[in-house]
Structure formats: C-alpha cells, structure tokens
Amino acid sequence: MFIHQTVRRNRSEFKINPHEEFRYFLIFAPLKQTFAMNYKEVIDNIYNEVKPFFGKGHVADYIPALANIDPKQYGIAIATLDGQIVGTGDYQTKFSIQSISKVFTLAMVVRHMGGDLWKYVGREPSGTPFNSLVQLEHEQGIPRNPFINAGALVVTDKLMNLYHRPKEAILQFVRSVAGNDDIYYDKTVAQSEFEHASRNQALGHFMKSFGNIDNDVDSLIDVYCNQCSIAMTCEDLAKSFLFLANHGINPHNNESILTVSRSKRLSALMLTCGFYDESGEFAFRVGMPGKSGVGGGVVAIIPGKLSIAVWSPELNEHGNSYMGIETLERFTTNIGISIF
C-alpha cells in the first residue's frame, strides 16, 4: 500500500530527511530504470557481441535429425508481462525444443497431482549428465529431479495416467500457453529420436523394474520423443513461459494454470536443476530460473517481469547452447536485474 500511494505523488510533496531521501532513491531508481528499458536495443547489442562466437560449440550429433541442422543460426526474443514482444536474429525460425518440453509436462502433472508427484521423483540437483543411469540404482529407481531424462520420463508416465490422449493434451497445453495454435510436433525429429532412444529405453525399463513406471515403456518413449520434438520459435517460447513469470496465470487468457506456490516451486526447480550439471554455474553467472534443450534452445524468466528465449544449435560440453548461455549472462548484466 505504501508504494502505491507514493507512486501517485510528486516527489516534491515529500518533506523527508536525508535517510528518507536515500530510501526513496533505493525504491524508485530501479523501478524507473525497469520501466524505461529498451529491450530491443539491449538484445540487438548482445546479438552483435555474441555472434562472433559461432564455432565454439557443436550440434547434438547423437540424434541425426538434430545433427543436420545449420549450426550458424542464432535468435533472441523477449516477452514482457506488459505486452512487449521484441526479437532479433533468427527468432522466428522454428526448432525442436527438446528438454524445454519437460517444464510443460511438469506443469501439467503438478497441476493435477500436486505434492503426490514427489513420491516418484525428487527435487535435488543431480550433478550428472542429463541421461545418466548412475544414481538410479543407488536411489531405488527414484530420479533426482524432473529435468534429467529419468525424471522427465516419470513425469510423462504420470501424465499418460492422467490423459487418455496424452500427445494431444501436451500439444494443446503448449499452444495455449504460447498463444499460438500453429505449434506442432516435428514428426521427422520425433521418429529420429525414437530410433536412437536406447538410453531412454534403458532408463524406462530400469525404473519399471523398481515399480516407478506404470505404462508400457515403448509407449512412454513414443510420447516422450514427441514432446521433445515440438517445434517452436524463440518468440513462441518466450510467450509460453510468461505464465511462470506471471505466478501461474496464463496472461494470454487469464487462465490459472498453477497456484502461486506451485509456480514458485517450479521456478525454483528450474533454477537448481534446469541446466543439468551446469545448473549451479548458470545460477552463478545468470541468476534466472530457466531451462535448456539439446536443440539449442534456452528460456529463462524474471518473475513479475518477463521471459527471454534464445536459440543457437551449437552446444557446450554440458549439452547447453553455448551462445544461449553467453547471451543470458550478458542480458542480466546489462539490464542490472536478476532474481537476486
């Protein structure tokens, strides 16, 4: 109430001592900077700074459909809660979102299961690669978190229990949060992934042996490969994560997707687990909850303000977009805002 009342007054109306003057500066100087931010100029400058980094990473080569992508593509898009959409570079080019889809399926399952989901998957960083089998045996088939492949398979398995037509439900959800009915599954990518899904098949069967997978493993892998193949642009992705920046409310239609509490917890998981064994480094360098995919996409949010999506197919040694990480580090540095 204090801030709302103060905003309506002229600063000259206040008779305040030097301590109050300093307090005024602390409260309103950052707000003024935020409201006046020219995001288009910011990302254009970052784009030009980062573009020379082409060639420092490599495309995902274990999925043929991804290995054949032109690596020299790079786009950035920002969507704000006050309705701004800005982009630069290849921000309107579609690409498969891969593991970014795990955020959508997690939101769908948490929406219906709530805390019951955590009986089947943990909430701790793994510190291991995204497709690792190592911890599962020690932890009795319970994956560390929902963003490594094993955890995402558990989430998709529960989603299959909730929806009679899970693939249709996932696509409908993504279209709704992105405000775009033209989003689709890339069947070529999905088929390519299914044909090279030996590790995910192993994860599924191993967890099923512990009783932590309910559905047929082949059917589970089919749904999972399709969700990873969803084709979106940077603009689509930025818009689709606004419901998390908006504390669980889809700003495109005012639908309540998650409670405020669940939205915060999902964002917390993105911060601690969203970048596999680089999650701590990302939090240290960037300071935003986010999620990456081996298709080269990265998306992150500043709660209450905006979401930003970056795409460049060349990956670093952790399987995250090399230029995407560089872009987001520069973004929070340049605007002077993160969650910390």
PLM regions and their residue ranges:
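Short, Lys/Arg-enriched N-terminal segments with co-localized hydrophobic residues
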Residues: K15-P18, F22-A36
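Active-site-adjacent helix/loop patches that line small-molecule binding or acyl-intermediate pockets
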Residues: N38-V50, F54-G55, R111-Q227
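A short, well-structured edge-of-sheet supersecondary motif
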Residues: K51-T88, V299-A300
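Short active-site loop at a secondary-structure junction
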Residues: K72-Y74, G87-M108, Y120-R123, P143
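Active-site SXXK
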Residues: D82-G83, S96-W118, S240, I308
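Active-site-proximal alpha-helical segments within enzyme catalytic domains
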Residues: V103, A107, A231-I249, I302-P313
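Penicillin-binding protein/beta-lactamase superfamily catalytic region
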Residues: H164, F194, Q201, H205-R265, ...
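Structured C-terminal helix/loop/strand segments within mature extracytoplasmic catalytic/sensor domains
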Residues: H247-F340
